[in-house]
């Protein structure tokens, strides 16, 4: 039996340096955001993120790390290099540049000694409103310890910019997209395939985009008994009511970052299961302010705190590979 430590983190605008190659359109969109974003500041930002990741999982770091708000593969490789040097592990990357307006992507980093990924079964689904925005990344993993297969789905849904209700239809579209691919995965691989969904959904577990459109529920029993529609069990309901959250806005915590699992992780004979009680929001004094909210790193153009990390807390869980 082996345990796999899985972490998700919104890295808060991990842009490449100000003078890195970009399309003219992206330069126009990011012009103010990149002012003063030097190689030195980027290196400091990466070091801060890696320092926090070094603290999790008994100082061993994650076995698989899902991230969002990463600009491109170049900056992702810089991040990986620092992570590998700090943890003495070798990670591989799953990433593709998407058409997001701000050029920020979803990616996975995974320990190559523990996992293999089927490159023929890696998919990048773009969520489109009036223009392409955000993405969903799907990858088939195989545990090198047990040879068991599972699917990870990373999400970064459209933001609440312009108002929560006004922007909600875009997240409903994202929820429909996730539900479709959850159905498709199970049609192809069978209901027994373990699926772990993670991401920054920019909505909470009880919002309609999650419950009605992504088909994610507080009831494991509903997931197990579902016949025609494959539901997802949302692990973040465990934190509802605890005044905990992953993102702080307008004097309140929000649970925007979430884990969800398919029926294949809930049945008694599941190939992989989430260790009971292992889901956690990772909070260390070094990544939070005195009042307990995330200490963001920011940008020179709008307030820089080089002792900060991100405006989101990471979340983690343990997968039991029996």
Label the predicted regions.
Residues 119-121, 162-167, 208-210:
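A short secondary-structure junction signal
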Residues 1-90, 94-99, 104, 290-293, ...:
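N-terminal, active-site-proximal structural segment of metallo-dependent hydrolase catalytic domains
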Residues 140, 184-196, 202-322:
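Metal-dependent phosphoester-hydrolase catalytic domains
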Residues 22, 29, 152-170:
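Active-site His/acidic residue clusters
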